[in-house]
Regions:
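Beta-strand-rich solenoid/repeat architectures in extracellular/passenger domains
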Residues: 87, 91-103, 129-146, 161-175, ...
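Extracellular beta-strand-rich solenoid/capping regions of secreted or surface-exposed proteins
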Residues: 58-86, 96-132, 138-158, 172-173, ...
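Positively charged n-region of N-terminal signal peptides that target proteins for export
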Residues: 1-5, 9
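Bacterial N-terminal signal peptides
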Residues: 10-17
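Sec-dependent signal peptide cleavage junction
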Residues: 18-28
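Hydrophobic beta-strand segments of well-ordered beta-sheets in folded domains
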Residues: 26, 47-55, 83-86, 129
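Acidic Gly/Asp/Thr-rich repetitive segments characteristic of extracellular carbohydrate-active
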Residues: 26-52
């Protein structure tokens, strides 16, 4: 009997070991800025971090999404874990709002260029933010920012899915009141019913046209609306 139990346990361990780590995701429900920051900064091990926002959260500082070093980070060669964050609303009243007076970006997506081996082979890691069923309000009726609401740099991807609204973003100096793409490897994607509205900047309201270096798919609201 003991041998049979041991055999079953060994078989179970072997099956679990075959489950890819990248297939897992975990979800946190947040109601405050501190909870949102904490959930976004979790060590993801290449898994997706899913966050549900309940109510309205005021953002008074830039929230960074960046890959984290693997356990090889202290060695001469290293790689990074991708950091992929999905933020959705608990209901129709869920919002992320710029705090009055805060002029920086609400989110900054910056990937990393890792290196591995004697030849220095590239191993880029990605920073990704997906918004769905939630409104992000840039607070442009009260504050004119100096940066776009969402700054997307190297190896960064911003995706707006069904129900995502990026609105009321007003910015000086930087191209794009709502989204700024600042590297050839950055990307902005809009799908389904996602929309941008009432955004304004020196160069392009939502996403600048002809003033960015990244890729954009589905071109909507590229000027002041």
């Amino acid at each position: 009997m003991k041998k049979r139990i041991a055999s079953v346990l060994v078989a179970l361990v072997m099956v679990l070991s075959l489950v890819p780590k990248t297939s897992w995701a975990w979800t946190s429900t947040v109601t405050t800025l501190e909870q949102l920051k904490s959930a976004m900064s979790e060590l993801s091990y290449n898994n997706t971090i899913e966050i549900v926002v309940s109510g309205t959260i005021e953002i008074s500082e830039t929230l960074n999404i960046r890959p984290t070093r693997t356990t090889n980070g202290s060695m001469a060669w290293y790689e990074y874990y991708n950091q992929r964050v999905v933020i959705s609303g608990a209901d129709a009243n869920s919002k992320l709002v710029r705090a009055e007076g805060f002029k920086g970006s609400l989110f900054n997506l910056t990937g990393e260029q890792g290196y591995s081996g004697a030849g220095g082979s590239d191993h880029p890691a990605y920073a990704a933010l997906t918004l769905k069923d939630i409104t992000v309000d840039g607070g442009g009726d009260k504050t004119t920012a100096t940066n776009p609401a969402i700054y997307v740099s190297r190896y960064g991807t911003l995706t707006l899915e069904d129900g995502a609204v990026l609105r009321n973003c007003k910015s000086q100096y930087y191209a794009g009141g709502a989204v700024g793409l600042f590297a050839g490897t950055s990307e902005f994607v809009m799908n389904g019913t996602a929309r941008m509205e009432d955004n304004e900047a020196d160069y392009g309201g939502g996403v600048p046209e002809g003033h960015h270096r990244g890729r954009r798919r589905r071109q909507d609201d590229c000027h002041k609306s």
